[in-house]
Amino acid sequence: GVPCKCGSKKGVYWFGQITGCPGGHGYKGSCNYLLGK
C-alpha cells in the first residue's frame, strides 16, 4: 500500500490494493481513510 491523497478530499488515504497514486488524485481498489495519518 501507498499513503496518498484520493480525489479532492483532504487527508491521507491508504491504498491496500494499488501501488502508487494515479495522477495524484482519484483511486482504484481499496481506499480507506485513516485519521491522524
Swiss-Prot record:
GO terms for cellular component: extracellular region; nematocyst. Its main location: secreted. It holds the Pfam family Defensin_4. Belongs to the sea anemone type 3 (BDS) potassium channel toxin family. Disulfide bonds join C6-C31. It is found in: Secreted; Nematocyst. Signal peptide: none annotated. Keywords: Disulfide bond, Ion channel impairing toxin, Nematocyst, Secreted, Toxin. It comes from Bunodosoma cangicum. One of its GO terms (molecular function) is ion channel inhibitor activity. This is Toxin Bcg III 28.78.
